[in-house]
Each structure stands twice: as C-alpha cells, then as structure tokens.
Amino acid sequence: MTVTGIIAEFNPFHYGHQYLLSQAKGLKIVAMSGNFVQRGEPALVDKWVRAQMALENGADLVVELPFLVSVQSADYFAQGAVDILMRLGIDTLAFGTEQLLDYQKLSRLYSEQAEHMTAYLATLPDHLSYPQKTQSMWEAFAGLSATGDRPNHLLALSYVKASAGKKLQLQPIKRLGAGFHSEAKDQCLSSATAIRKHIADRAFVEKSSPNAALILRAPQVTWEHYFPFLKYHILTAPDLTQFFQVNDELASRISAAIRSVATVDELVEAVATKHYTKARVRRVLTYILVKAVEAPLPEGIHVLGFSKKGQAHLKTIKASVPLISRIGAKPWDQLTQRADTVYQLGHTDMPEQTWGCVPIRPEAMN
C-alpha cells in the first residue's frame, strides 16, 4: 500500500487543503507545524484543533513538527519534515504547488549536482536574500525562470532538495483557487491568509473551510496577543545574541527599534532589509519570544492524532521508531513545550497544549 506524506500547517484548514488530501494516495501521514508556523508567527488556532480538522478530512495520522523544524527557513523546514516522514515509512510525498514541473527530475539533478549547486550559491552577492540566491541557482542549473511570489512552488523546490537521494516518489498537486498570500474574499477556494485576515466575517469563514465551526469556536490568536511578552523579553534580555539565529546586527536593529514601535508589524518593518527578509525577522522575533536557543531535535515523534488505519500503521513501526503519545513528567522536546506554554498565554480560554494531552481519534469523537 502506498504511504503518502504531506507537510502542512493548516493555518487554518480550508477547502484547498481538503482537495490536497483527497488527491493524495493510500495511507496519508501529515507532518504538521505546532503552535508556531514557518513564516514566524503563532498559528491562528492551536495544533490540536488543526490536527482534528485534518483527521476529519482524510488524514490517517498527524504528527507534530518540533519547534526548531516548524519555525525555520524553507530548506530546513523541508529537510526536518521529510526526515520525520521517512522515519514513519512514507514512500510518496504529496504537496501543493502553483507550478507543475517534473520535480522528480529536479530531485535527481540535485542529488547529482548538490555540491556544485551549493558552491554556486556562495558566489552570489551578499546583498541578495537567500530565496533570491536559490531562485538564481535553479535558473542556472535547471533553466527555471524566476518564480516570484509563489511560496508553494518555492517550498516544493525545498522538498526537491530534501528528497534528493531518497527512495521517495514526489506527487505535485496543482494548487487551486486563491494565491497563497491572497486576501481576496471572492475566490472559489480562499487562502488561509484570507481566512486569517477576515476571521471576524463568519459567513466568509463558513464558505471557506469545511471545519468552520471548529475554527470559529476555538480561541484565536495573532502576533499582537504576544507583543507585550516579546517587548519585555527584548528590553530585559542582557544579550539578544544568546537566542537562536540572532546575530549582532539583528540584535542591534531590534533593540534600536523596539521603543518606537507599537506592533509586531511595525517592528518587522523597522528591522527588515533586503538582506534580512520580513519572514526571517518574524522567525527571529519568534525565537526571542520563546527564548529559543540551538538544541538537538528530539528523537521521539509526537503523535497528535490518528484514524483506525493510522493506528494500525503505528503498530507496524513502533518497535523501530520512538513514538510519543502522551507527554507527562518526562519531556518530549523542552523547546517545543516552552513554545506551547508561551502560546497558551495568548488567550485566557486557550486549553492545555502539552501535559496529559492524548492523540485525537475521530472515531472516538463520533
């Protein structure tokens, strides 16, 4: 039987995600971001709600990406997620993309030319951001034209690199409806960005997500719920460079800007440059918020939920893969658990995110 892996955030789950799951083959395993997501912000609703949405729409198993995989640049995000999915026994990786290409061929190319392609990146001028350098690399070695603002396609190219040299079939699925960053309300399939933007419009959310009721009744948070905590950490930290990926220049820019801004968006605008993209700045601010430092990734894999098929699959691999189904006195990943504690501070009604939580089983909820 085909075992398909899907890397996702479901922030929040919408009909485009439902379509992606419907097109994936066989047993479907989702490696999902936790309570903070790749572009450096808190998820709109918590990881347990998002896992439930996935399970109600065809996923068989949902596992959590550790914080230092979830909140990373595209290449590290992709590599960490693919590594976890491979340990869970996938043979296929399905992903949405704005541009259907022969990604399998690109993966073979990268497995053969990785050393030269990496060396090419080092020759590019420093004023270019890493995403710009990556686009230039693919244009030089594979003839791909500049991809512009197409995040799913850019992420797909990171999956290409992460899957190089592995026995893994790539299954690109054409993204339907609104663009990734589109805030438009008049698309047949609205984006997660649009749902977050218009979350107060109940009718819009109801037409945009098969799980609207779950989204609307769950505690919802944005960066602004955490700005006072972030500001406190910045103003009181003796040295911001102690935190993950904060260098002297970023520390200086953040410290200089924090007293004159009133929101996270204003802080990001003040700190970002051509070299330091807004996404990178948001990730760095997230590291400061949760006091993240470099640490090894956890050996165990945290299970958020499963169907009957997913449970049967877990039984076949549990002897070879350490699976965490309940976090108690013994921690799973201290950094991820600290991030969960910070996340809970964003809303007075936010439920417990770690201690004693057990995997969601849709059949048991019916």
Curated annotation (Swiss-Prot):
The keyword Translocase does not apply. InterPro entries: Rossmann-like_a/b/a_fold, tRNA(Met)_cyd_acetate_ligase. It comes from the Bacteria. It catalyses: cytidine(34) in elongator tRNA(Met) + acetate + ATP = N(4)-acetylcytidine(34) in elongator tRNA(Met) + AMP + diphosphate. GO terms for biological process: tRNA modification. ATP binds at residues 7-20, 96, 152, 175. It holds the Pfam family HIGH_NTase1. Its main location: cytoplasm. Keywords: ATP-binding, Cytoplasm, Ligase, Nucleotide-binding, RNA-binding, tRNA processing, tRNA-binding. GO terms for molecular function: ATP binding; ligase activity, forming carbon-nitrogen bonds; tRNA binding. It is an enzyme of class 6 (ligase). It is found in: Cytoplasm. Its EC number is 6.3.4.-. Disulfide bonds: none annotated. GO terms for cellular component: cytoplasm. Transmembrane segments: none annotated. Catalyzes the formation of N(4)-acetylcytidine (ac(4)C) at the wobble position of elongator tRNA(Met), using acetate and ATP as substrates. First activates an acetate ion to form acetyladenylate (Ac-AMP) and then transfers the acetyl group to tRNA to form ac(4)C34. NCBIfam families: PRK13670.1. Belongs to the TmcAL family. This is tRNA(Met) cytidine acetate ligase.
